[in-house]
């Protein structure tokens, strides 16, 4: 795929995150301590973005997703300038930002709202009494205040709620509140991740994160006793794999036509 054929970009502009979500790959074993492979210095500056993605390369881009696998958009102090650069280079480009929303000032969110063709998807997993059970280290009221400031200035905001056992009774209340606050869309989704214990800084279990009891995607529960066995279950079947990272003969490789990136003309940066 040539660059001129690319229409969608998925950008990860920060390796930093203010949240400590138990099921995030950033925090092994649902702890408070980051995976040693994470480099918190991997935060893009506006100069780096302009160098790597100059306006001439962005002019034909139609969609940009800013979503962190390990970090959150709001932890980048150049975030506003980066989004403005994308819009200036491609004014009709639709920009979607996924964030926990629990940082920056109301004024900062108002400034973000001034950028056209932008949607911010706030991760709000329940009401004030349940949200931070999963989105640890975030503040529900701060997120609501930031979303309110963003929406008040004309910003387009979505509310996405991940349904767990501890918040499944609040879906309708969250949907009602989202409507009252002016969110454009409310999305409720189940998780396909297994149950895990949330641990404090001393390694002690404070509570459990479990899928909703009516979830169609439940995979089972990881207990303290079988956690290590679950993590290494693939190693117990070496016959399924070949050396040198080669795929087993019995597992067909997808054709190029099945590649999502090629079909959607999208790349991850």
Show the residue positions of the predicted features.
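Recognition helices and adjacent regulatory flanks at domain boundaries
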Residues: 1-6, 19
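Radical SAM enzyme [4Fe-4S]-AdoMet core and its adjacent flexible, acidic
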Residues: 4, 12, 27-28, 32-47, ...
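Conserved Rossmann-like nucleotide-binding pocket used by diverse enzymes
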Residues: 9, 65, 158
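Short metal-coordination and nucleic-acid-contact micro-motifs, chiefly zinc-binding Cys/His arrays
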Residues: 10-13, 17
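Short, surface-exposed acidic/glycine-rich loop or hinge patches that mediate macromolecular interfaces
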Residues: 16, 102, 164-165
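Short cysteine clusters
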Residues: 17, 21-24, 259
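Conserved SAM/AdoMet-binding glycine-rich loop
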Residues: 19, 26-30, 46-126
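Short, hydrophobic alpha-helix immediately C-terminal to the catalytic nucleophile
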Residues: 22, 80, 172-175
């Amino acid at each position: 795929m040539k660059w001129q054929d690319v229409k969608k970009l998925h950008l990860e502009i920060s390796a930093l995150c203010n949240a400590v979500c138990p099921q995030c790959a950033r925090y092994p074993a649902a702890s408070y301590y980051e995976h040693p492979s994470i480099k918190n210095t991997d935060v893009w500056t506006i100069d780096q973005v302009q160098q790597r993605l100059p306006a001439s390369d962005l002019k034909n881009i139609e969609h940009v997703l800013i979503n962190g696998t390990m970090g959150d958009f709001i932890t980048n102090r150049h975030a506003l300038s980066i989004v403005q650069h994308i819009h200036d280079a491609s004014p009709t480009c639709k920009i979607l930002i996924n964030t926990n929303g629990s940082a920056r000032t109301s004024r900062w969110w108002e400034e973000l709202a001034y950028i056209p063709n932008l949607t911010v998807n706030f991760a709000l997993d329940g009401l004030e009494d349940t949200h931070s059970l999963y989105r640890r280290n975030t503040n529900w009221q701060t997120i609501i205040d930031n979303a309110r400031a963003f929406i008040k200035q004309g910003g387009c905001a979505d509310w996405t709620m991940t349904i767990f056992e501890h918040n499944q009774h609040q879906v309708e209340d969250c949907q009602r509140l989202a409507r009252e606050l002016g969110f454009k869309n409310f999305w409720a989704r189940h998780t396909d991740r297994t149950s895990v214990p949330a641990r404090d800084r001393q390694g002690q279990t404070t509570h459990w994160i479990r899928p909703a009891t009516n979830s169609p995607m439940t995979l089972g529960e990881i207990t303290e006793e079988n956690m290590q066995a679950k993590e290494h279950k693939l190693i117990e079947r070496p016959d399924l794999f070949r050396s040198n990272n080669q795929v087993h003969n019995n597992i067909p490789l997808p054709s190029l036509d099945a590649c999502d990136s090629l079909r959607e003309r999208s790349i991850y940066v």
